[in-house]
A protein has these predicted regions:
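Intrinsically disordered, low-complexity, hydrophilic segments
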Residues: 1-67
Length: 67
């Protein structure tokens, strides 16, 4: 799955995202709404990671979620 597909299938993968990044709240995930950039921003905010680290995690998440 790529970043574009994440948005289209967000309802399917939202639970997986919350399992992976437990510090993300339901409100955070509502704001993200499948947007990879928003997800990276929330990971950066909640976990104190650099933008690059957060984007790498999102990319890895997208690649491990087989559609």
């Amino acid at each position: 799955m790529n970043r574009d597909q994440l948005q289209g299938k967000w309802k399917q993968f939202r639970g997986r995202a919350q399992e992976k990044w437990g510090k993300l709240t339901d409100d955070d995930l509502d704001v993200v709404d499948g947007k990879a950039d928003q997800l990276a921003g929330k990971i950066q905010e909640r976990y104190g990671k650099t933008r690059e680290e957060a984007e790498k995690e999102v990319d890895e998440f997208c690649h491990t979620c087989n559609c």
